Amino acid sequence: MSPSAANTPSYDDFALALEAQSLDSQKGQLVRGKVCEYSTDGAYIDIGGKAPAFLPKREAALHAVLDLEAHLPKDEELEFLVIRDQNEDGQVTVSLRALALEQAWTRVAELQEGGQTVQVKVTGSNKGGVTADLEGLRAFIPRSHLNEKEDLDSLKGKTLTVAFLEVNRADKKLVLSERQAARTALVREIEVGQLINGKVTGLKPFGVFVDLGGATALLPINQISQKFVADVGAIFKIGDPIQALVVAIDNTKGRISLSTKVLENHPGEILENVAELQASAADRAERARKQLESQ
């Protein structure tokens, strides 16, 4: 065999190279291509393989496409996701819709990671809550996480500001919360050293839960008085209005810690006359703020 013949690719070499090129386009891979032909149920996409890929009409976008030629001009190169391996003719099936959904899950995960709130439009309701659309994904907002819990049908078509409760790409589960979004917004407005007004909503051995009108704060038992407190129920009752100083904020977890002991003029004052301390809380807060700043 001559050197030139040895270096000349054989028919088998071409066949192997062509097969390798076809195998490059497998399910889950991204390919680039242009429309080369339209059909009644889709379009054929030139991706440089053995055969053009097929794009079903239902996979052309997240929404229904009526005019495929207007939606996908022939001279426009786009990126597609392979959703079905090649058939016996070497043709793979591709999708723009599946690619858009994958990109949407990535964006939503990034928004959740950043603690962002988003706006969604309510698309429907059931006994458990409402459904909404976010980036083309179907989301669910439980009834317990809505501001309006009674007439859910009235929410259809409305835009809500929500936070993320769960983003699960594998299970295609996207759960949102309107109440948490409101709480997040309120927490961001509150500052350490601020005197807040609230209402007592819970009494526990470890402290008092205070509703701030959209967010719940905790007044720990060791922050009630400079003196030992044996029973929070001896000082506060459910429904009591309360003023307290914000001493700590955890923006990541949405937690607000309060204190009334910093408002006392002497240890145990709140145990003796809680009404007097609350009535003059604004004047006491200025002194307490200076003490916090000096620490």
From Swiss-Prot:
Role, per record: Binds mRNA.
Gene: rpsA
One of the GO BP terms on file: translation
Record-level Gene Ontology MF annotations: mRNA binding; structural constituent of ribosome
Keywords, in A-Z order: Repeat, Ribonucleoprotein, Ribosomal protein, RNA-binding
InterPro entries: NA-bd_OB-fold, Ribos_protein_bS1-like, Ribosomal_protein_S1-like, S1_domain
Species of origin: Synechococcus elongatus (strain ATCC 33912 / PCC 7942 / FACHB-805)
Domain of life: Bacteria
Family: Belongs to the bacterial ribosomal protein bS1 family.
Residue span, S1 motif domain: 28-97, 115-179, 193-261
Name under which the protein is recorded: Small ribosomal subunit protein bS1
